Amino acid sequence: MDIKVTLTQNKKEKPDYSNLPFGVYYTDHMFEWDYTEGIGWHDPRIVPFHNLEMSPCSMVLHYGQTTFEGLKAYLGKDGEIRLFRPELNMERLNISNERLVIPKFNVEDGVEA
């Protein structure tokens, strides 16, 4: 998978890593991946964090359609990032998505993204 990366020009101030409350600090970037009927998932990209724009007809607004991606990443003492069972996480996400009529994605692509 070829993921296009666009880096932000406005980096946020880094928080105190010894005091990180949940849901207060956000990354400088976000992952986006388009879906088109008949084509499937395409154009994966990492872009600067921004507000989302969506149609008033979006299913999520009418039916509360959402799934939670709970992948955990840890920084090792050697400076390497460790992911905890990413393949199983992506498989669970696909199962949840299927229940809400959200199209499945390739698990390997999800892990790479």
Spell out what each predicted region is.
Residues 1-113:
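Conserved alpha/beta cores of soluble small-molecule-handling proteins
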